[in-house]
Curated annotation (Swiss-Prot):
InterPro entries: MIC60. Residues 136-164 are annotated as: Disordered. This is MICOS complex subunit MIC60. It is a single-pass membrane protein. Residues 136-145 have a biased composition (Polar residues). The lineage of its organism: Eukaryota, Fungi, Dikarya, Ascomycota, Saccharomycotina. It comes from Meyerozyma guilliermondii (strain ATCC 6260 / CBS 566 / DSM 6381 / JCM 1539 / NBRC 10279 / NRRL Y-324).
Length: 528
């Protein structure tokens, strides 16, 4: 069809240029108009459109059906990953932007051709046609008819004819997205001058194809919008369910965290409450002592105020006795101060005596009681004697703290325990007293045998220096609770008996020193 247009245009131009013919050319017999030829562009456009729709529909179905998706993955058609990604994650705005970009590209295509290009293309077609006709005539022996070149050499009659143009396409009933394409076709039609019987049919066919294209675009857009709405609705439901599930999970996590934090806060609050209760008890006990002191001080102040008011009330009538009242008031003030000092001293003394009594009771405790450390009670004693500021008491505390700081109520032996250990130690002392100097195994054996033959002495011999007299005096002193004399007798031993009694002497001295130092503090406190 396009070749016919160019041939007709070329023939018209030829008629305008060539001179008038001398001999009229021999015209070929009339030929019947050919039937409507096959349109390759229309076929390609339809096939491309149908193939694209089928390909896109197959990939869209693959997103919904696993079997189709397996088929697509097995055969791997071209660009299937990109199209699937666009179907799953694309949006209407992206499709519209792509369509607008494609439409702009089509509208920017330059379909207009210059007249020189058309003439050149027509000359090429004419030359190829002449060559084809010559070859055909040579083959079939038909050389009688003049060739187109011969016809051109003959003068022809010159006629003036204005070029006709094809009718333009109409925009009526066409989708707006195809307007740019229609405009491009109209520009192409304007650039072509043609006169022939099939021009109107050609324009009508193009108009029908454009209308069908517009209808298909509308149908495709409507189906795409419907499918998009369905997908959006399904996605909305899925998102709503997922958000609801996440909300429930977050609520459970928050409740669990809340319960955990609540339990921890309750635990901390209970511990803090117990600590505050203990502090409050201690503060209340201290406040009770302070309250007694404050009441006495307040009574003294009230008495002073009463006296002052009495003096001020009777000053005008009894000025002669004012000096006596002033001296009496000074005496009362001194008495109040001395009374306050005595009260404080009595309180400190009672606190010190209580601490000393607790230490004595712990030192004298029996084995059946629970062992207790003496360090806290020593701390209470130090705090109690600190306000006194006495040098003797401070020196005594420096001696007693290293002695009893690491001891407990069971580590310091009582008098009965010392007596029991002395009785257990007595046989060994008797045996050791019979050992000669540098005794060997035989000496130890004989001393053990002869020690069994010794008869224990009943009663104490004040002047006896033998081992039996010493053992008897120690036992008698322990029975009379005279620990200092017992330690002195045990320390007077010599040789192996003194070595054997060394541990007993250390334990006895520890108790003796503790009792002596506590008694010294108690006596000093009483003398204050």
């Amino acid at each position: 069809m396009l070749r016919a247009r160019f041939s007709t245009s070329r023939s018209v131009l030829t008629k305008v240029v060539t001179p008038p013919p001398v001999v009229p050319p021999v015209l070929p017999p009339p030929v019947k108009p050919p039937k409507k030829s096959f349109s390759l562009p229309k076929f390609l456009f339809s096939a491309t459109l149908i193939g694209s729709l089928a390909y896109g529909g197959t990939l869209y179905v693959a997103t919904k059906n696993e079997k189709v998706m397996d088929y697509v993955i097995d055969y791997q058609p071209p660009f299937y990953e990109e199209i699937l990604r666009m179907i799953e994650t694309g949006s209407i705005d992206e499709i519209r932007d792509a369509w607008d970009s494609l439409r702009d590209r089509i509208s920017n295509v330059d379909f207009s051709s210059s007249k020189s290009k058309i003439d050149k293309f027509a000359n090429d077609l004419e030359n190829r046609g002449e060559q084809l006709i010559q070859k055909t005539r040579q083959r079939w022996g038909q050389d009688t008819a003049p060739t187109p070149h011969e016809q051109l050499q003959k003068p022809v009659e010159t006629t003036q004819k204005s070029p006709e143009s094809l009718p333009l396409l109409s925009y009526k009933g066409i989708n707006e997205s195809v307007h740019a394409t229609v405009a491009s076709f109209n520009e192409l039609i304007k650039s072509i001058d043609i006169s022939g019987p099939g021009s109107n049919d050609l324009v009508k066919a193009i108009q029908d194809n454009v209308a069908k294209l517009s209808q298909k675009v509308d149908a495709l857009t409507a189906s795409f919008d419907d499918e998009l709405k369905k997908n959006l609705k399904v996605s909305q439901n899925e998102l709503l369910s997922s958000y609801t599930k996440k909300e429930l999970e977050l609520t459970e996590n928050l409740l669990h965290q809340y319960n955990t934090e609540r339990a921890q806060l309750e635990k901390k609050l209970n511990a803090r409450l117990e600590q505050e209760i203990a502090s409050a008890k201690e503060a209340i006990s201290q406040a009770a002592v302070n309250a007694v002191t404050m009441v006495r001080i307040e009574q003294t102040k009230n008495f002073e105020k009463l006296v002052k008011d009495k003096v001020d009330g009777e000053r005008s009538g009894r000025l002669a006795n004012l000096d006596k009242l002033s001296s009496r008031l000074d005496e009362l003030e001194q008495f109040a101060e001395s009374l306050e000092q005595q009260i404080v001293a009595n309180h400190n003394r009672s606190t010190i005596n209580r601490s000393l009594a607790e230490l004595r009771s712990l030192i004298s405790s029996t084995e059946g009681t629970t062992p207790k450390s003496l360090a806290p009670y020593l701390g209470q004693l130090i705090e109690a004697v600190r306000p006194i500021n006495d040098e003797l008491i401070d020196a005594t505390l420096k001696e007693i703290v290293p002695l009893l700081q690491h001891e407990s109520s069971h580590s310091i032996l009582s008098t009965s325990q010392l007596l029991a250990r002395w009785e257990l130690l007595s046989p060994e002392l008797r045996s050791a007293s019979l050992l000669p100097p540098n005794a060997g195994l035989l000496g130890h054996f004989t001393s053990f045998v002869f020690s069994k033959l010794l008869l224990p002495v009943k009663g104490a011999k004040p002047n006896g220096k033998d081992i039996e007299s010493v053992i008897g005096r120690v036992e008698a002193n322990l029975v009379r609770n005279e620990l200092d004399l017992a330690v002195e007798e045990a320390a007077s031993l010599k040789g192996w008996p003194r070595k054997l009694a060394d541990d007993w002497v250390v334990e006895a001295r520890k108790r003796l020193e503790a009792e002596f130092l506590l008694g010294l503090i108690e006596g000093e406190v009483r003398s204050l």
